[in-house]
Amino acid sequence: PRVLLIGDSISMGYTLDVREMLKGKANVHRIPTNGGPTTNGLKNIKAWLGDSKWDVIHFNWGLHDLKYIAEDPSKRADPKAPGSHLQVPLADYEKNLAELVKLMQATGAKLIWCNTTPVPAGSDGRVEGDEKKYNEAAARVMTAAGIPTDDLCTHANAKLKDVQLPANVHYSPSGYHYLAEKVASVIAENLSKK
């Protein structure tokens, strides 16, 4: 079965481990770049899906949507600085996700939503805990569409001090391996349901 991973740098961090863990069970692919915010997803989703047939698509957007930016969208801004704003406000995020889900559902693949991992205190350009609001918005979209959730946020929170880098949304190599165990297990469960 062919599996496509869509996500940001967090998914980049766990891809190789997931591929190794599913060796002999699935052919694991990943989009060729950082998925960025949902606005980037909408621009690129058709190219990422291509003409290939996908059995499972495991996808996430969030950490870039809830990032604060100023004039230059490629640079993070202090959330308290004048002129800084969310890259994708919550209502737009929810609307964009619903649109992305429709486009992915059209492929006939089994979809698995992966919720957004924790934003710790001191994380540059982000506000601690903002992932909760974005995950709630995403949950409304996924519930309406009947899409299961890989709750990577709760999984990461269980060992956050051991697996996440200090004041950073990223993870240590062993932290990415820990995330990969959950991702691979959820994908494996859904392969048999296809």
Segments from the language model and where they lie:
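Catalytic nucleophile-elbow at a beta strand-turn-alpha helix junction centered on a G-D-S/GDSL motif
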Residues: 1-16, 37, 64-66
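Short beta->alpha junction loops
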Residues: 30-37
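Alpha-helical cap/lid subdomain in secreted, periplasmic
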Residues: 20-27, 39-193
